[in-house]
């Protein structure tokens, strides 16, 4: 899959996704092992109004001021999403407009 930007799980990657660009994102840390290893790149596609999000999707999102490549653990009324890592730690509930990208491919 082609991408137009390569960066880390941060504001700049989120901005490119908000512009409709597909990006390669590199997450740092072990919170998503064994699904993702630290510094393992993924391809994220932009999340738009019509994007369908499901439990267990890996997304680039912002929770309480921090950017994460984490899982959707629960969905409430199709409008709120519980974000957390792969080891059971929950970051919190966010709205869809705080989800910038959805992992389409793990590299």
List each model region and its residues.
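Extended hydrophobic leader/signal-anchor segments used for secretion and membrane insertion
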Residues: 1-107
């Amino acid at each position: 899959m082609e991408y137009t930007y390569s960066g880390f799980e941060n504001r700049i990657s989120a901005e490119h996704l908000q512009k409709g660009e597909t990006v390669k994102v590199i997450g740092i840390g072990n919170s998503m092992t064994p699904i993702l290893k630290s510094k393992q790149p993924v391809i994220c596609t932009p999340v738009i109004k019509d994007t369908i999000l499901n439990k267990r999707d890996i997304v680039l999102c912002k929770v309480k001021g921090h950017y994460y490549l984490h899982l959707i653990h629960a969905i409430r009324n199709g409008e709120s999403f519980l974000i957390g890592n792969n080891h059971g730690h929950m970051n919190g509930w966010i709205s869809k407009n705080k989800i910038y990208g959805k992992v389409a491919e793990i590299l």
